[in-house]
């Protein structure tokens, strides 16, 4: 049955790819794009313009400076989101999937690249992924908090309840993650459709009262803003960037709905609605440059309570999108061998992409609640926002250069010109955000360094462990020859041994033979390989090889968006001529006990200890490979690092 569901998942992916090139996209798919993809960037009007203006002294908030900031927001949305992400970066899909790890896998730096290039790509990709974890903690905090701050305008007497209410909403949001979003996700799209229509109408109303604001589409005002304000204009870029914080999510979430629906909804609805609202806020600020909450003051007083409620729903949806994105990113990292095995819970029997990661969920919840309690306002929290996403954008641009050259075969001049053009803008935003380090920007950087250290240590430690075991293990060819020469006693049943190296004898097999002096009649060696593609169709999943003396080798292929299920794979082997009775099958696993030491070459001792700690606390292979616990025997081995 699980195999059938994977087949149907592959079929859904195939039909989605067909829709991706079909101009007659369904309304349902476009609504899904609104709910899944656009939540983050949709809620930026709550705080982006306000925070950009806060970097200007009150006596310098002239009409020219307001128009200058508005012009910067306009052209940033056009150049970075519309052109860079929607038209260029989203072409770099890995069999329909996007995101920085999918982009890294697309480049396949593990195979054939020069050593220095391989190291640079892996470090960039892993650090970019690590930065997104910081974004996953800050986005829920600042989004929900900024929505609740609408109470300051609607009901000033309720201001003292903003922090407690935000905390309660965040805790509830993270607590319901284990139930999945399959049901409530269906209403996300319609809610976001209402949100975009409302913010567009609010902005249009502001523009009608002050249509002169439309001159800000002229880039002259943005350029003039820099020439007139100098250093303070550079600081403003950190606030302007908040209008772009959901751009990376457009690429990361591409696998959910496909490229075409995302592009269609951006140009048909999302971009016009955002621009109307930003220009409406600009019109309001031209009339009152000292307005503290320009977004909420666009609404008539009678609509404020409804707007606060709608904004809260929109920010919850935005938070849900980034939380789900972190879960998906974590699964990719685990399957690609860049993270320890963590418990993964499939929350939908229909959508293979919906997964819940308890460890990541509680870590993000604690961090988000701490951020709210520590910073206490979205103004203060804005200092911590932006660094993670702007850093990821820089890394995405660099990785995209290699895609242009190696995958799209662009000539060097075109690739360099496009990359340098985007990098100049990306680095300007990133540098401006670095000025926020003392105001809270240290938090996402600290989280990124912490996560990156874990990921790079796990990856290198795993490689060292595999090398050490390989050196100390008998080749399977020699082992098989020994079995033929001196046959052991055979007992009924099937023994399954999981092995990483196809040409090595699994340590558990050696120890089982030494201690029991016998082998099962049927011995199956299983190697699970995670390919650098999101999904491997069920028809291409298995390779079955008959060896000799009752031995078979099975190679099982999965994509990095799939969860391995060894019993299901073994059951499917019957279609390839190998029948395995799962009721009489015993699974033998090797459990390595790691001994950190500084006597061997490799990592520093503290990293050896960190790797050993992660290995001890990673999810058991029994659960990870969906093995029945009552049929599993683990044999321990000691390995010096």
UniProtKB/Swiss-Prot annotation:
In terms of domain of life, where is this protein from? Bacteria
- Which keywords describe this protein according to UniProt? Cell inner membrane, Cell membrane, Ion transport, Membrane, Potassium, Potassium transport, Symport, Transmembrane, Transmembrane helix, Transport
Region annotation (Disordered) ranges = 1-20
Q: Its Gene Ontology molecular function terms?
A: potassium ion transmembrane transporter activity; symporter activity
Signal peptide region: none
Reaction catalysed by this enzyme = K(+)(in) + H(+)(in) = K(+)(out) + H(+)(out)
- Stretches with biased composition (Polar residues): 1-14
Pfam families, per database record: K_trans, K_trans_C
Q: Which compartments is it annotated to reside in?
A: Cell inner membrane
Q: Which family does it belong to?
A: Belongs to the HAK/KUP transporter (TC 2.A.72) family.
What the entry lists under HAMAP family is as follows: Kup
Function statement = Transport of potassium into the cell. Likely operates as a K(+):H(+) symporter.
Q: What is this protein called?
A: Probable potassium transport system protein Kup
């Amino acid at each position: 049955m699980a195999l059938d569901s994977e087949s149907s998942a592959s079929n859904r992916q195939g039909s989605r790819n067909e829709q991706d090139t079909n101009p007659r996209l369904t309304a349902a798919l476009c609504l899904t794009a609104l709910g899944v993809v656009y939540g983050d960037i949709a809620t930026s009007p709550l705080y982006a313009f306000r925070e950009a203006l806060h970097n200007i002294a009150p006596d310098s908030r002239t009409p020219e400076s307001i128009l200058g900031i508005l012009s910067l927001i306009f052209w940033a949305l056009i150049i970075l989101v519309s052109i860079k992400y929607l038209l260029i970066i989203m072409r770099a899909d890995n069999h329909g999937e996007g995101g920085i790890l999918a982009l890294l896998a697309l480049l396949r730096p593990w195979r054939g690249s020069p050593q220095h290039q391989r190291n640079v790509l892996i470090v960039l990709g892993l650090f970019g992924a690590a930065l997104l974890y910081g974004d996953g903690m800050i986005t829920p905090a600042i989004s929900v908090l900024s929505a609740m701050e609408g109470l300051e305008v609607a009901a000033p007497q309720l201001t003292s309840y903003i922090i407690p209410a935000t905390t309660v909403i965040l805790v509830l949001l993270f607590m319901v993650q284990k139930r999945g979003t399959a049901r409530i996700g269906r209403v996300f799209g319609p809610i976001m459709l209402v949100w975009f229509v409302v913010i567009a109408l609010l902005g249009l109303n502001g523009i009608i009262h002050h249509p002169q604001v439309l001159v800000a589409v002229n880039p002259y005002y943005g350029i003039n803003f820099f020439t007139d304000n100098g250093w303070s204009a550079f600081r403003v870029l950190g606030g302007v960037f908040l209008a772009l914080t959901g751009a990376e999510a457009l690429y990361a979430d591409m696998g959910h709905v496909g490229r075409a629906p995302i592009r269609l909804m951006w140009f048909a609805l999302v971009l016009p609605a955002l621009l109307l609202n930003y220009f409406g806020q600009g019109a309001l600020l031209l009339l009152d440059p000292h307005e503290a909450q320009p977004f909420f003051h666009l609404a008539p007083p009678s609509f404020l309570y409804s707007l606060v409620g709608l904004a809260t729903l929109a920010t919850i949806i935005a938070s849900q999108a980034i939380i789900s994105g972190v879960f998906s990113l974590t699964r990719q990292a685990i399957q690609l061998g860049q993270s320890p095995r963590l418990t993964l819970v499939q929350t939908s029997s229909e959508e293979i992409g919906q997964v819940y990661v308890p460890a990541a969920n509680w870590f993000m919840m604690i961090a988000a609640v701490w951020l709210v309690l520590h910073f206490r306002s979205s103004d203060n929290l804005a200092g911590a926002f932006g660094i993670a996403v702007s850093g990821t954008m820089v890394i995405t641009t660099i990785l995209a250069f290699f895609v242009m050259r190696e995958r799209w075969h662009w000539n060097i001049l075109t690739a360099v010109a496009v990359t340098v053009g985007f990098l100049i803008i990306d680095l300007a935003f990133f540098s401006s955000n670095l000025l926020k380090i003392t105001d809270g920007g240290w938090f996402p950087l600290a989280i990124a360094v912490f996560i990156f250290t874990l990921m790079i240590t796990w990856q290198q430690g795993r490689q060292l462990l595999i090398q050490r075991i390989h050196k100390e293990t008998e080749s399977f060819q020699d082992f098989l020859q020994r079995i033929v020469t001196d046959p052991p006693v055979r007992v009924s049943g099937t023994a399954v041994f999981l092995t990483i190296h196809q040409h090595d004898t699994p340590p558990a097999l050696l120890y089982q033979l030494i201690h029991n002096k016998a082998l099962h009649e049927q011995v199956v060696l299983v190697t699970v390989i995670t390919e650098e593609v999101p999904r491997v169709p069920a028809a291409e999943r298995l390779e079955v090889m008959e060896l000799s003396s009752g031995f078979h080798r099975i190679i099982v292929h999965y994509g990095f968006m799939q969860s391995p299920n060894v019993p299901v794979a073994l059951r499917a082997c019957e279609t390839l001529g190998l029948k395995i009775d799962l009721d009489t099958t015993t699974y033998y696993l090797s459990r390595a006990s790691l001994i950190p030491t500084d006597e061997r070459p490799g990592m520093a001792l503290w990293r050896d200890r960190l790797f050993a700690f992660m290995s001890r606390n990673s999810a058991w292979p029994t659960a990870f490979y969906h093995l029945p616990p009552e049929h599993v025997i683990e044999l321990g081995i000691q390995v010096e690092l």
